[in-house]
């Protein structure tokens, strides 16, 4: 099997079969990540560029480690220190990187659709590392991989996503991916943080966290997106925590063996209490490990796809 596109721009337009293919490949990569010898030569001779127009710690470092573990040459470009500051356009930046022989460009941008624009104008494969409020596909893939590891399947599971759904690209990618894989998705948050007509993409919307979490197999907290919000969407952080924060008492509404996830960074005492964040049902640290494995899988599959096309075309 091969990925159909040269790019990974989102989970909205990817098939369930492709998602399964990526997750199965990530299982092999997880063995490398957790071994004493993390070096392989799968991507030797390949050039991976991270192009980030927004700050990032987890995602950027995860991709850089994934590249190095696979034997690729990796370079990071920050918008603050690039020719963007001199007025260079996104397309011109992409073409410059392309001309230097890059194989994959990993891009984060504050504007929704920016990775799609880049992908149309470069020969390199483009991976969306988060675009505005649109999608964050690799985060959703690592979330699904973590669930699959702990539950053995995605089909038929009830997943409760709690928090700022409106501004969350993580929520959107998870909704697209989880529903395609047969999971039932519940969402809850302040009415001002729930997108209008979100039910049309296959989720159940609840006004209370208690309803959304009842008998859930997975509870996913979302970070309050303060940097993306206009004022007045909810009274105070304290009020948000009171009505929508997940603590030990509320977690008991979920199934006894429910797992807790969060894309990070966690605002302790807001989305999740410290006891839930550090508790036995929390697999937040495992998500970080799995992020490297999933991104290794993507780098491998996208570069492999190019090699296959060169041979067969």
From Swiss-Prot:
GO molecular function, one term: amino acid binding
Biological process (GO), any one: amino acid metabolic process
Keywords: Pyrimidine biosynthesis, Transferase
Reaction it catalyzes: carbamoyl phosphate + L-aspartate = N-carbamoyl-L-aspartate + phosphate + H(+)
Keyword Transferase: yes
Pathway linked to the protein: Pyrimidine metabolism; UMP biosynthesis via de novo pathway; (S)-dihydroorotate from bicarbonate: step 2/3
Entry annotated with the keyword Cytoplasm: no
A cellular-component GO term for this protein: cytosol
One Pfam family here: OTCace
Cross-referenced InterPro entries: Asp/Orn_carbamoyltranf_P-bd, Asp/Orn_carbamoylTrfase, Asp/Orn_carbamoylTrfase_sf, Asp_carbamoyltransf, Asp_carbamoyltransf_Asp/Orn-bd
Enzyme nomenclature, EC number: 2.1.3.2
Binding site for L-aspartate: 86, 169, 223
Amino-acid positions noted as binding carbamoyl phosphate in the UniProt annotation, renumbered to this chain: 58-59, 108, 136, 139, 264-265
Top EC group: transferase
Annotated function: Catalyzes the condensation of carbamoyl phosphate and aspartate to form carbamoyl aspartate and inorganic phosphate, the committed step in the de novo pyrimidine nucleotide biosynthesis pathway.
Family the entry assigns: Belongs to the aspartate/ornithine carbamoyltransferase superfamily. ATCase family.
Quaternary structure annotation from Swiss-Prot or TrEMBL: Heterododecamer (2C3:3R2) of six catalytic PyrB chains organized as two trimers (C3), and six regulatory PyrI chains organized as three dimers (R2).
Protein name, UniProt field: Aspartate carbamoyltransferase catalytic subunit
Gene label: pyrB
């Amino acid at each position: 099997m091969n990925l159909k596109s040269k790019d990974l721009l989102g989970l909205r337009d990817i098939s369930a079969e492709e998602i399964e293919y990526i997750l199965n490949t990530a299982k092999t990569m997880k063995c490398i990540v957790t071994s004493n010898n993390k070096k392989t030569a799968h991507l030797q001779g390949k050039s991976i560029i991270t192009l980030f127009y927004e700050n990032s710690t987890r995602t950027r470092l995860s991709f850089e480690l994934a590249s190095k573990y696979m034997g690729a040459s990796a370079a990071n470009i920050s918008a603050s220190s690039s020719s963007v500051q001199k007025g260079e356009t996104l397309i011109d930046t992409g073409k410059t990187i392309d001309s230097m022989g890059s194989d994959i460009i990993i891009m984060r941008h504050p504007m929704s659709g920016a990775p799609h624009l880049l992908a149309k104008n470069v020969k390199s494969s483009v991976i969306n590392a988060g675009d505005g409020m649109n999608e964050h596909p690799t985060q959703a893939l690592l979330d699904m991989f973590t669930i699959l590891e702990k539950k053995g399947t995605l089909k038929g599971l009830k997943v409760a996503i709690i928090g700022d759904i409106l501004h969350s690209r993580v929520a959107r990618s998870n909704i697209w991916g989880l529903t395609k894989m047969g999971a039932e998705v519940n969402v809850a948050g302040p009415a001002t943080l729930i997108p209008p007509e979100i039910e049309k993409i296959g989720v159940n919307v609840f006004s209370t966290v208690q309803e959304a979490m009842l008998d859930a197999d997975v509870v996913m907290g979302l970070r309050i997106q303060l940097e993306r919000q206009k004022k007045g969407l909810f009274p105070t952080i304290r009020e948000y925590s009171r009505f929508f924060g997940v603590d030990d008492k509320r977690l008991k509404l979920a199934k006894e063996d429910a797992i807790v996830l969060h894309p990070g960074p966690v605002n302790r005492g807001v989305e999740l209490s410290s006891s839930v964040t550090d508790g036995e049902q929390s697999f937040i640290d495992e998500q970080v490990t799995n992020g490297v494995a999933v991104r290794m899988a993507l780098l491998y599959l996208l570069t492999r796809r190019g090699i296959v096309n060169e041979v067969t075309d």
